UniProtKB/Swiss-Prot annotation:
Record's compositionally biased regions (Basic residues): 35-49
Subunit structure as annotated in this protein's UniProt entry: Homomultimer; when bound to the RRE. Multimeric assembly is essential for activity and may involve XPO1. Binds to human KPNB1, XPO1, TNPO1, RANBP5 and IPO7. Interacts with the viral Integrase. Interacts with human KHDRBS1. Interacts with human NAP1; this interaction decreases Rev multimerization and stimulates its activity. Interacts with human DEAD-box helicases DDX3 and DDX24; these interactions may serve for viral RNA export to the cytoplasm and packaging, respectively.
Positions carrying Phosphoserine: S5, S92
Assigned GO CC terms: host cell cytoplasm; host cell nucleolus
Gene Ontology biological process terms in this record: mRNA transport; viral process
Protein name (Swiss-Prot/TrEMBL): Protein Rev
Organism: Human immunodeficiency virus type 1 group M subtype A (isolate U455) (HIV-1)
Location, primary (coarse class): host cell
Lineage of origin: Viruses, Riboviria, Pararnavirae, Artverviricota, Revtraviricetes
Length: 123
């Protein structure tokens, strides 16, 4: 896979064909034989599947030029997150004036959360 044809779709299709061929070359083990023989065949088959998985991952990362796993999204600490509901509470379904945004606010710390929650007793 070191040579590139120049067409990324063609390269990807070629990689998928190679991976498909690898998986087809290792069918499920035969369910006949003694219990120990079946166990050994399954163990060897699982080891081959792990090798095929790692090869497939390497082929795809080479073809795509990036790792198969996405880079984890860096989020701010949960203490700094809050919903911005200062003016739009209770106005569900109405349009906001130009220039105002609602939804998830910036990383602001809500101070009035204990007053809103109260002590937990009903009136």
């Amino acid at each position: 896979m070191a040579r590139r044809s120049g067409n990324p779709d063609e390269d990807l299709l070629k990689a998928v064909r190679i991976i498909k061929l690898l998986y087809q070359s290792s069918p499920c083990p035969n369910p006949r034989g003694s219990r120990q023989a079946r166990k050994n065949r399954r163990r060897r088959w699982r080891a081959r599947q792990r090798q095929i998985d790692s090869l497939s991952e390497r082929i795809l990362s080479d073809c795509l030029g990036r790792p198969a796993e996405p880079v984890p999204l860096q989020l701010p600490p949960i203490e700094r997150l809050r919903l911005d509901c200062s003016e739009s509470c209770g106005t569900s379904g109405t349009q906001q004036p130009q220039g105002t945004e609602t939804g998830v606010g910036g990383p602001q710390i809500s101070v009035e959360s204990s007053a809103v929650l109260g002590s937990g007793t009903k009136n």
